[in-house]
């Protein structure tokens, strides 16, 4: 079995790392010292599609798999654990339940 990352996964890792280091990293200490939740950074991450990694494109998601999801969470968490866990919680704990168990109207309203 080959456990190597695909070319697309390597590119995703580079892209998320560049985003995290460039857009999130410079602000981490300010949010931490102010003891504030980084709402603005969450919006930036959402605009990149990270809050919909696992969900189909027809519902506004990226249509990617769990390996890609872990890459996104890992790279975001390298720079700021709060953003990484926020993305993980949204994809796994919240939206995934609506996607799996909700009706079509709920999916269209709340996913991703």
Regions found by a protein language model. Give the residues of each.
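A non-catalytic, amphipathic alpha-helix used as a structural packing/dimerization or gating element
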Residues: 11-22
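Intrinsic disorder at enzyme termini
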Residues: 1-8
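Glycine-rich flavin
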Residues: 21-112
